[in-house]
């Protein structure tokens, strides 16, 4: 099992995933609550966080605030944390560095199934934008682990 986090300045999305890619838990919550979750979940699960990368362009305060939260999440973890860059997620899920959030979501639906409806929930029922990205991060980690074996 794995805890995957898409960090933000005040809230972060997370997904807990089994080794078969099935979803145990997901959501988006305030970063302080994410820290509390990390303290309990990483007793059992490894953790992966999307890491910020510099592409030579100016960045704003939000990027630096997110970096601080990434550090706090790592500090709260009881196991080794893997950092994965967004470009690696794009390449793994879509085979293109130019992939957008929409193309990542489409590729995940193609691979695992549709979102579904309340009456007929699918693999991703209840997912929202940032949760999709946390799941893509977790899938990338699990795919890379399988390649190593």
Kindly give the residue locations of the regions a language model identified.
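Phosphate- and other anionic-substrate recognition elements at nucleic-acid/protein interfaces
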Residues: 1-149
